[in-house]
């Protein structure tokens, strides 16, 4: 027993666990549908954990050594990358803000924020990352209409014509924040966080996001169907950080409409931008 059976049993019980966490943009239901087949593997295993505006895929391998476990996790992670593409934005990080800051650092870029309904939440998330002072210097909280005009150059006539919660205002906020700060990238948010303030055209949960780089603003509309103030603000901040990441990576953010800086006061261009989102 001591010389043969016991050593054999101990050897069979000896194993190491290694884990790798993929951070994925988007909701859980859509993600689970896309990767369902990969969640049924016995070793490595994979499980989805839902967060606001994103998910974690935790891959865990059981192996004879940590090195072997890492290789197994890495090989299995490639299957998720192949299936999900750049929806997988990073590995083993605390959150999207960490990836945004690190990407800006790697690219030698800076960022500014212009926030209304999020009230500084985007800036708070960015500055929670150690070293963020290298890339983030200006955060404008422009809750009042006059603050939007004074601090980031939103035209009061644009607010009056299109509403403060609109694509033209989000575009002007982003372009204005970039100009006022001198940052390479600027993101903006204007919306109705609730529980009051909505109407038929812009119900509670309606948010417009802007992101500007190289003289072009990219605008996106977000609608959070559950009228929960904290959730609307959290989802808006997450979506703004996603726009920032794509611009930092040199990509055009998906599902956005562009407005050039040269057209920020062009009535026809602003009306076309506004109409695009209202039709949707």
Kindly give the residue locations of the regions a language model identified:
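Short alpha-helical segments enriched in small residues
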Residues: 68-280
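Short acidic-glycine loop/turn motifs at beta-strand connectors
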Residues: 52, 63-64, 213-215
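Accessory alpha-helical/coil subdomains and C-terminal extensions
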Residues: 1-53, 58-60, 68-73
């Amino acid at each position: 027993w001591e010389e043969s059976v016991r050593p054999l049993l101990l050897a069979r019980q000896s194993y190491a666990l290694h884990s790798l966490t993929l951070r994925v943009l988007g909701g859980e239901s859509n993600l689970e549908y896309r990767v369902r087949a990969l969640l049924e593997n016995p070793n490595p295993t994979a499980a989805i954990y839902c967060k606001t505006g994103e998910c974690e895929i935790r891959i865990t391998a059981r192996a004879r050594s940590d090195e072997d476990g890492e290789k197994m996790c890495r090989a299995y992670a490639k299957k998720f990358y192949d299936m999900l593409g750049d929806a997988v934005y990073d590995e083993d990080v605390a959150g999207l803000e960490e990836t945004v800051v690190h990407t800006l650092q790697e690219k030698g870029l800076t960022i500014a924020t212009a926030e209304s309904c999020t009230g500084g939440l985007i800036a708070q998330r960015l500055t929670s990352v150690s070293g963020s002072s290298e890339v983030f210097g200006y955060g404008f909280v422009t809750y009042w209409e006059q603050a939007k005009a004074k601090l980031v150059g939103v035209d009061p006539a644009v607010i009056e014509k299109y509403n403060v919660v609109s694509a033209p205002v989000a575009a002007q906020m982003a372009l204005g924040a970039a100009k006022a700060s001198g940052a390479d990238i600027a993101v903006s948010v204007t919306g109705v966080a609730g529980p009051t303030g909505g109407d038929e055209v812009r119900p509670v949960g309606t948010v417009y996001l802007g992101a500007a780089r190289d003289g072009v603003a990219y605008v996106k509309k977000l609608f959070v169907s559950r009228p929960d103030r904290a959730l609307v603000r959290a989802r808006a901040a997450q979506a703004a950080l996603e726009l920032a990441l794509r611009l930092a990576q040199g990509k055009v953010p998906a599902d956005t409409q562009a407005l050039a800086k040269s057209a920020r006061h062009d009535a026809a261009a602003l009306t076309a931008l506004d109409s695009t989102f209202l039709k949707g």
